[in-house]
Regions:
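Extracellular/periplasmic carbohydrate-active domains that bind, remodel
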Residues: 1-300
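Low-complexity, Ser/Thr/Pro/Gly-enriched N-terminal "stalk/linker" regions
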Residues: 301-357
């Protein structure tokens, strides 16, 4: 009865129940008073555990959930093993542990209409009230196909998240948008730290291999001023054959709350738009042996020449003692050489000027 059907979601959105529910949460209305039921357009999860321990979900196939597929909430000691999720409906997340600890997700296949795995810890006031981070989570030997993200933190992450380890996974689809994704905003707040991914093989993804976004849903109606922090995130030994971006980081505008981000020993080919793009306030974003489209990505401080004028000056001073005279030489030989040299330097400047490598 509740399975996803094309077009039904849009009809339910017109009822306004979701907006009313979110307003109740923002205003601190007690849980027991947030009552909705049949005919009001809110979709349930397929599997939902609340305040439970020692949970095992094993060797089952779940299809066409109306909302999130597996959603343990405030639980401990969870194993999801050998599960296949096929759910192309909206908000069709595969597995969303929320405010949970000690979680193992392994040997699973995800084909979803939203995030494959999305780790959460409460939305805005609710998450701050619980104050229970999701922590100690291992994701391994999984395959991610369609979805908004392979391994995702957020966006309902107000209680924080720490100690997430994803390894030995395969991801590939023109409809898989990101590989490792962190999404939050200043409605949420919370501390996200110690997020690590290694040994992941990617055929293609639609947007970015690594995306950190601190300005997710900027038009959300909420009380703001709760600046989140994202720190100690690493990606190592990850390969990708096609994407629009390699690394895409959107930091905050007010505080330097994205820092200690490390991409190491990774190789991204077929990057169409931009190898790396970092905006907003960030600190210590490091690339170590990151190869994108066959070129080594240098950290800004490691580049031998920071500006076009620095390169030009150094080049000419090395070549002749009175290099300034070359600019005014009337000899055809030197005019020709300077023209080639200036053109090459200009091309290099245009390539590097926005921080590209």
């Amino acid at each position: 009865h509740f399975g996803y059907k094309e077009g039904v979601t849009k009809e339910h959105q017109k009822m306004g129940s979701r907006a009313r529910l979110q307003k109740m949460a923002e205003d601190g209305v007690p849980f027991d008073e947030r009552k909705f039921g049949m005919g009001q357009g809110l979709r349930p999860q397929l599997v939902n555990f609340v305040r439970s321990e020692r949970i095992l979900i094993k060797d089952v196939k779940m299809i066409n959930s109306p909302f999130w597929v597996m959603h343990p909430l405030l639980c401990k000691d969870i194993t999801v093993d050998g599960v296949t999720v096929w759910n192309e409906g909206p908000n069709g997340d595969g597995c969303d542990p929320e405010a949970c600890e000690n979680v193992l997700i392994q040997n699973c296949i995800f084909h979803t209409g939203d995030d494959c795995i999305a780790i959460k810890s409460g939305r805005n006031n609710d998450g701050r009230l619980w104050n229970q981070p999701s922590k100690n989570i291992i994701i391994r030997n999984c395959r991610m196909e369609d979805g908004h993200g392979g391994v995702v933190i957020g966006s309902e992450i107000s209680g924080g998240c720490e100690n997430v380890y994803a390894e030995n996974c395969e991801m590939d689809s023109p409809h898989l948008e990101r590989i490792l994704r962190i999404k939050t905003n200043n409605c949420r707040g919370g501390l996200i730290q110690n997020i690590h991914m290694r040994k992941v093989t990617v055929g293609q993804c639609k947007e970015a291999v690594l995306k950190i976004n601190l300005d997710y849903e900027p038009r959300e109606a909420c009380y703001r001023g709760f600046e989140p922090t994202v720190r100690n995130v690493s990606m190592e030994d990850v390969t990708c054959q096609k994407s629009n971006y390699g690394v895409l980081i959107i930091g905050g505008n007010k505080v330097e709350n994205v820092y200690d981000i490390h991409v190491k020993n990774c190789k991204f080919d077929g990057v169409i738009k931009q190898p790396t793009k970092v905006t907003g306030k960030t600190r210590n974003v490091k690339f170590d042996n990151l190869i994108i489209n066959g070129s080594l990505v240098l950290n800004k401080e490691d580049r031998p020449y920071q500006t076009y004028s620095e390169w030009l000056t150094h080049s000419e001073m090395q070549r002749v003692p009175q290099s300034y005279l070359l600019d005014f030489s009337k000899k055809p030989k030197w005019s020709y050489v300077m023209g080639i040299e200036m053109e090459g330097m200009l091309d290099t400047y245009l390539h590097y000027k926005d921080g590209k490598s």
